[in-house]
Design a protein with these regions (language model features):
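Basic/aromatic-rich interaction segments and small domains that mediate binding to polyanionic partners
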Residues: 2-64
C-alpha cells in the first residue's frame, strides 16, 4: 500500500497522539516509520519524544 509520508520526512502534526492522548498543535516532527497493520505513523518530535498518529493528523513540512 502507498505511504503518503516516507521515513525521515519532516511533518507538521495537528491532532491527538495514541500513546498518551496528548494534543499536538502545529508541532514539527520526523517520521520514523509506518505501522503496516494499523496504518498509523510513529513520529519523533524535536524534544525527543515519540508518539503514534493517524495520517489525517500529519501534513508535509514546507520551508527550511
Amino acid at each position: 500500500m502507498f505511504s503518503k509520508f516516507k521515513a525521515k520526512d519532516k511533518v507538521i502534526v495537528n491532532g491527538i497522539g495514541k500513546c498518551n492522548g496528548k494534543e499536538y498543535i502545529n508541532q514539527t516532527a520526523i517520521v520514523i516509520n509506518r505501522d503496516p497493520f494499523f496504518l498509523d505513523y510513529n513520529v519523533r518530535f524535536e524534544d525527543g519524544t515519540e508518539d503514534w498518529l493517524e495520517e489525517e493528523c500529519l501534513r508535509k513540512f514546507k520551508g527550511e
